[in-house]
């Protein structure tokens, strides 16, 4: 193979030299390797021989066209037909045609393997395709049919068997023209090829939506109607436009609605009977709503049976419709878009009770006329309330806000009166001292100090009254190993003194019983100091005291409530 390569190189290099310097006998010199080809060569060897012969033939063609050679194309073809084997005889007609459209180095066969499955990709075509699909007339120039076109037919014929390769090999000059498919054809082909893949319809829809948006050319409303036959086309269109023409979001909402409707039907079909709820009319106060004419209407729980007709359409019995919370629809008019928008803010797994102007807010997000007529909705709600009351212990209620403010004002009123008198006496004493009446200034200062002592005594009594009222002796806010220390209404110095005393008592109790005690300390969030120049000082002071003085780590399960563990 090295000899072949070396033999072809001088001939190729000769084409770049001027015709006047060429050896006139160089065209008649043929290497010995080309006269007697090796019989045991592989496909790679044949390929390289083909490349060498093609380059030599090209050189001969160039010389026939120049003034240095007197051979015609026919003489060159006859010459090489006698000198080269039949299977590597070059086709001068094809190469002449290629010379008109490509340069001398555009067609390279050096790295070509005749038995490579991807060989057709190495031949660029001017028509936009790949391979010699438009030039199959190569075989007509050879008698035995063992030409290059015959060998290149294998990958071309295999394109029909491999759809992926065929689609790649038959690319058009404008590939974006064929990007849009028919969604119905795509759905039909997938269903015929894979009738059941173990996925639900909604999973298949999600797979379809995750594809490129340009691959579908179908009306979104028609697509939704085909996937959700239980809903009206008008309602689907309203939901689709209400979601900003987001098809994925619309399908997710419709899927949740369909699942909720199926769950409601299963509850109605089940033969389980519910006990009548033990509720009084006070549990269901009359709610005020506005009808279609804007006139307020009053109705209680017994009128729910009459409103059940608004959840069904008189024309289409097989459709499922929902009504929005704050409005009551007339027969046949469905506020479906509001129901879908409300779905995002509702929890389908929990039953909610809202005290607002909604006519149907006492039941959860999934309801129908059957549940209202049979009274099962209220029964389910009452059963859930009873079960929660039995399983959960009674919470510890701590009054805050106005209750604390009123108590503070009432019990601290006497101390504030003494404080005002003290300030008046101190101001008069200062004025008397400034004018030089020191005796009067001293007398007024003594009266001010007396009122200051009375103020402190009043604050002490108010502190004890406030703490005992917020933390009674037989306090109901202590259960098990949990204790509650409520410091609402106390000043910082008073709260720290009380906290130090209570923690010492609880620590002694924990050591005596050898148990861990969980202490909750209620310090508030500073609502009473809101609007003043100074922020709330009690929470910061208590936190610093626990860390620095007591050495206790605390956590804050909610704002204004600290939790420590003593053992």
Swiss-Prot record:
Gene3D superfamilies: 3.30.1370.110. A motif (PAM2-like) lies at residues 21-31. Disulfide bonds: none annotated. Residues 215-259 form the CUE domain. Expressed in cauline leaves, stems, rosette leaves, immature siliques and primary inflorescences. Contains a PAM2-like motif, which seems to be involved in the binding to the PABC/CTC domain of PAB proteins. Interacts with MPC and PAB2. PANTHER family: POLYADENYLATE-BINDING PROTEIN-INTERACTING PROTEIN 7, SMALL MUTS RELATED FAMILY PROTEIN. This is Polyadenylate-binding protein-interacting protein 7.
